[in-house]
Amino acid sequence: SFIPIGSFLIYKIEKEYHSHIKIPEIVDGILILGGATDPLLFKEYDQISLNGSAERLVESVPIIKKFDKAKVIFSGGSGIINRPDLGHSQVAKSFYKKIGIEIDQIIFEDQSRNTYENIIYSKKIANPKINENWLLITSASHMKRALLIADKNNWKLIPYAVDFKNIKNFKLIPNFRLL
C-alpha cells in the first residue's frame, strides 16, 4: 500500500498558513521571494518559464495592483554557482512586463542565492521602518523558514502564503476501511 508521508509532512508545515492572515489596509512594502521560474529554460528559449511554485508570481499580481503605492521587491538571483547570469529576477522582470505591470515600480534584487540572502539583501534595499507593514509572498511550505530568518534579522513580515501542495483537510489515511 502507498502512504503519502511526503504530503503529510508538507501539510504539517503548510497548515499554519491555510487561512490568509488579514492584510492590513495600509501595506508599505511587498517582498516576493524567487524560486518560481526556470532561468535555464528562459535563457534557452527566450520564453517565460514558470515551475511548480508559479503562484509566487501569479498571486503577487493582484497584491501589487491593490497596493500600488507600496515598495515592491522581487528577490531572486541565481542559485547556480557557475551561472550567476541565470537568475530568477530576469524571468520575473519579463513576466511582470508581459502582463502589464510597470516594472519601474518593482526593485529586482538579483544577487541572492538562497532564502537567507533573499531576506538580508532585500532588507538592505527596503530599509523598513519599525511601524511599516511589509507582506512576504512565498510558498506556504517555505513561509516558516523565511519568517524565522526575517525575525532573526529584526524584520517583521506579514505572511501571504501561496503555492499550497495539500488541501486544508488532508488526512494521512483518509478512510481506515480502505486498509
Which stretches of residues belong to each language-model region?
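A structural signal for short, hydrophobic/glycine-enriched beta-strand patches
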Residues: 2-177
